[in-house]
């Protein structure tokens, strides 16, 4: 079955765990099936999925599990680190499974410049046999995706999309101007309406873990430029509630609070205890559901 990867909404999915830190496969399948029901693409093993806290064997097990479900929505897998050989090994494994596309983040921690970034991304794109979405998230990597990367690689056959999460609308506009054929996704839930105005065509979302149906409608209206000031306030509140402490703590806490996963357990260094007050999530949940009921 051919899968269309140009889904307007991908959910950066959490990885549910039991209290001992082992993966809760039953809860994981339920989350995946929920996303499938609402026709959301799924991103597994991104930062929201705590990929860097899982060892290689666990990551492989996650990919096997998800791809064996034969979901009817596209499956994107995160690629990220600072050891190129390991990333290429990871891609090689994923390509033995039914993975549809990759999310490739700027190298972590090392802050490479334009030439170094270009070399890194070219090596990854050359290895990949699937479409790749580059990922600009300087709040996590310490460096922006260099514009020269897009100038040099925009015609690479495996470069498909860009996830933009710098918070800089003008930077997104420049990326779009440099590579107009690149599909741009907002990587920030609350900024989708603004990024849609400068060329974004979709969202890679954290909050759709919590509100998949409602977020799908929000994406549709944002891309149609139909979001009002009042609508914007609702979704900004929803975004704040899911990022009040380090992601994915709030999402896991809320999913567990609503019995959608068994526990709110995270892998070290993250602890659910960072979020003691659920008032922002409770308020946002009410706002989002009220908004949706009046659409």
From Swiss-Prot:
A GO cellular-component term linked to this record: cytosol
UniProt EC number: 4.3.3.7
Family: Belongs to the DapA family.
GO terms for MF: 4-hydroxy-tetrahydrodipicolinate synthase activity
PANTHER family the record matches: 4-HYDROXY-2-OXOGLUTARATE ALDOLASE, MITOCHONDRIAL, DIHYDRODIPICOLINATE SYNTHASE
One GO biological process term: diaminopimelate biosynthetic process
HAMAP family from the UniProt entry: DapA
Residues at which pyruvate binds: 48, 204
Catalysis performed (reactions): L-aspartate 4-semialdehyde + pyruvate = (2S,4S)-4-hydroxy-2,3,4,5-tetrahydrodipicolinate + H2O + H(+)
PROSITE patterns reported in the protein's UniProt record: DHDPS_1, DHDPS_2
Kinase is among the record's keywords: no
Native source species: Francisella tularensis subsp. novicida (strain U112)
A Pfam family of this chain: DHDPS
Subcellular location(s) per record: Cytoplasm
Superkingdom per UniProt: Bacteria
Site residues, Part of a proton relay during catalysis: 47, 109
Keywords of this entry: Amino-acid biosynthesis, Cytoplasm, Diaminopimelate biosynthesis, Lyase, Lysine biosynthesis, Schiff base
Function according to Swiss-Prot or TrEMBL: Catalyzes the condensation of (S)-aspartate-beta-semialdehyde [(S)-ASA] and pyruvate to 4-hydroxy-tetrahydrodipicolinate (HTPA).
Protein name (Swiss-Prot/TrEMBL): 4-hydroxy-tetrahydrodipicolinate synthase
Active site: 135, 163
SMART domains for this protein: DHDPS (SM01130)
Major place of residence: cytoplasm
Pathway assignment: Amino-acid biosynthesis; L-lysine biosynthesis via DAP pathway; (S)-tetrahydrodipicolinate from L-aspartate: step 3/4
Oligomeric and partner information: Homotetramer; dimer of dimers.
């Amino acid at each position: 079955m051919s899968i269309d990867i140009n889904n307007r909404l991908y959910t950066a999915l959490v990885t549910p765990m039991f209290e001992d830190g082992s993966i809760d496969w039953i809860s994981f399948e339920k989350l995946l099936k929920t996303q499938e029901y609402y026709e959301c693409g799924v991103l597994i093993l991104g930062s929201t999925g705590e990929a860097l806290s899982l060892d290689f064997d666990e990551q492989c097990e996650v990919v096997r599990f998800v791809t064996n479900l034969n979901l009817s929505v596209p499956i994107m897998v995160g690629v990220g680190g600072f050891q190129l050989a390991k990333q290429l090994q990871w891609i090689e494994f994923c390509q033995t499974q039914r993975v549809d596309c990759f999310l490739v983040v700027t190298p972590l921690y090392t802050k490479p410049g334009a030439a170094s970034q270009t070399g890194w991304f070219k090596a990854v794109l050359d290895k990949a046999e699937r479409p790749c979405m580059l990922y600009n998230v300087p709040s996590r990597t310490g460096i922006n995706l260099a514009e020269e990367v897009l100038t040099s690689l925009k015609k690479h056959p495996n470069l498909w999309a860009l996830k933009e999460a710098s918070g800089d609308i003008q930077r997104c506009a420049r990326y779009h101007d440099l590579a107009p054929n690149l599909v741009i996704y907002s990587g920030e839930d609350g900024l989708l309406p603004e990024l849609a105005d400068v060329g974004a065509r979709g969202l890679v979302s954290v909050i759709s873990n919590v509100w998949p149906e409602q977020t799908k409608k929000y994406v549709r209206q944002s891309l149609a430029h139909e979001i009002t000031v009042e609508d914007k306030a609702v979704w900004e509140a929803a975004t704040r509630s899911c990022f009040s402490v380090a992601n994915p703590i709030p999402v896991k806490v809320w999913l567990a609070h609503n019995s959608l996963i068994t526990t709110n357990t995270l892998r070290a260094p993250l602890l659910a205890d960072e979020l003691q007050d659920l008032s922002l999530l409770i308020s946002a949940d009410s706002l989002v559901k009220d908004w949706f009921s009046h659409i």
